[in-house]
Amino acid sequence: MSAHDHFSLCLCDLIRLLWSLMLPCFYLSFLLTTILFLFIMGVRSWLQMKRKTRRVQDGRPAVAFFHPYCNAGGGGERVLWCALRALQNRYQDVSFVVYTGDQGVTAEEILDGARRRFNIRLPRPVKFVFLKHRLLVEAKLYPHFTLLGQSVGSIFLGWEALTEFVPDLYIDSMGFAFTLPVFRYLGGCQVGSYVHYPTISTDMLSVVRERNPRFNNADYISSNPVLSAIKVIYYCVFALLYGLAGSCSDVIMVNSTWTLGHILALWRTPNRTSVVYPPCDVQAFLDVPIGEDNEEKEQKKCHSLVSVGQFRPEKDHQLQIRAFKKLLDRKEAEPAGREAVKLVLIGGCRNQEDEDRVLMLRGLCQELGIADRVEFKLNIPFQELKKDLTDATIGLHTMWNEHFGIGIVECMAAGTIILAHKSGGPKLDIVVPYDGGPTGFLADDEDNYADAMERILSMSPATRLEMRRRARLSVSRFSDQEFEGSFLSAMEPLMSTLRA
């Protein structure tokens, strides 16, 4: 037998073997698929039975908000409480639930925190479901593949929420898109989402492709072409999964033009997506009159630069501190010197990681020799925030591609001259010309920020007053009333199904 014939026989034997295995593999796959399908249907039936039992006992449909950090005190939490207030006022025959991962606090303490921080009182009580496994969505649990880890963790946290309470309508108000298919396909719920910030964006892909080091792209990755290529593939696959999860939503609300562009590109649901600007308590600031300082008072005044935002890495407080250091260096030559300005950093801490970041920032101030001119204010009540903003000269913001920027709007309403990052929502939606004139300043690096600070401080009181008044007029479109109207309009298709 020739070698060719022997090879042909071996090939034929291999084909026969593979063919003989195909049928058992097909049967096994069919069996496993059937078991999985029956299991999913069984779980779905069990959950729907729980909902029917609850409806019999309560007699009312329930709307649940998934917000694991509802006691954090940031802009996302303001959206949550304003949304709940609007829905409670409109729909008296619906009960409302909040899934939260906060531990060691009571429902009364959470609601009292919302009242103190945001000046928001709910007309009726809400039920809180306290989740025990919020750690699953903490970034510190996933030092590598953080996006994937947090997203998978959110699926398990969502499952815990669903088994604790099965709502009729589920709203993800914190950006955990991978919980949407859990509630839709297992819970049989109508689902909606309010997106503050896409979990992944084309900008993030660009950062990795161009190998730029940032807070979400470590130096050792940006400096290695192989690791950068692997991360690009990882991001692309994750973006596909994120888009599939997000597209499960029946109604999608986004908070800015910038977010809208990215969500449309990833979720591809234009008919179900609309922009609903987040609520900003502008009226509380607009009620405070602003006046013009004369030249004499101007020379004696200590100008405060105020930053409002949670102490998260992407807020880039380091940029604020370093730019402020450059401003102080330039102020040394002036008569009033360093004493003429101070930096006030106001924000909330969600967890120990944020508290450690504050310690690091305090250390940076010590290292730069400016600790005496920088003040940190953590988790302060609303009235104190209001006073600090109305007393400030400059409102400072440094986050790259901020999705919106409630703190920016509050600064403008309070009468500060805003200095924000030249990207994202601030550039596209907020710090835009109004009535033929500028409403603030934009910058993107330490030198630009220091230059803008110096320019603002050198403006005459009359010129600053004109810009402050113009900025105040421009922010009326971000009021609580505007948000409530837009939010209720977007939610109407879903809420109408509850009454059917």
From Swiss-Prot:
EC number: 2.4.1.131
Intramembrane segments: 232-252, 404-424
Protein location: Endoplasmic reticulum membrane
Keyword Transmembrane helix in annotation: yes
InterPro entries, sorted: ALG11, ALG11_N, Glyco_trans_1
TM regions (residue ranges): 21-41
Keyword hit for Transcription regulation: no
Metabolic or biological pathway, per its Swiss-Prot or TrEMBL entry: Protein modification; protein glycosylation
GO BP term (any one): protein N-linked glycosylation
Alphabetical keyword list: Endoplasmic reticulum, Glycosyltransferase, Membrane, Transferase, Transmembrane, Transmembrane helix
GO cellular component terms, A-Z: endoplasmic reticulum membrane
EC category name: transferase
Lumenal side: 1-20
Membrane topology annotation: Single-pass membrane protein
Main location: endoplasmic reticulum
GO molecular function: GDP-Man:Man3GlcNAc2-PP-Dol alpha-1,2-mannosyltransferase activity
Cytoplasmic side: 42-231, 253-403, 425-500
Recorded catalytic activity of this chain's protein: an alpha-D-Man-(1->3)-[alpha-D-Man-(1->6)]-beta-D-Man-(1->4)-beta-D-GlcNAc-(1->4)-alpha-D-GlcNAc-diphospho-di-trans,poly-cis-dolichol + 2 GDP-alpha-D-mannose = an alpha-D-Man-(1->2)-alpha-D-Man-(1->2)-alpha-D-Man-(1->3)-[alpha-D-Man-(1->6)]-beta-D-Man-(1->4)-beta-D-GlcNAc-(1->4)-alpha-D-GlcNAc-diphospho-di-trans,poly-cis-dolichol + 2 GDP + 2 H(+)
Function: GDP-Man:Man(3)GlcNAc(2)-PP-Dol alpha-1,2-mannosyltransferase that operates in the biosynthetic pathway of dolichol-linked oligosaccharides, the glycan precursors employed in protein asparagine (N)-glycosylation. The assembly of dolichol-linked oligosaccharides begins on the cytosolic side of the endoplasmic reticulum membrane and finishes in its lumen. The sequential addition of sugars to dolichol pyrophosphate produces dolichol-linked oligosaccharides containing fourteen sugars, including two GlcNAcs, nine mannoses and three glucoses.
Similarity comment: family membership: Belongs to the glycosyltransferase group 1 family. Glycosyltransferase 4 subfamily.
Name of this protein: GDP-Man:Man(3)GlcNAc(2)-PP-Dol alpha-1,2-mannosyltransferase
Classification lineage: Eukaryota, Metazoa, Chordata, Craniata, Vertebrata
Designated gene of the protein: alg11
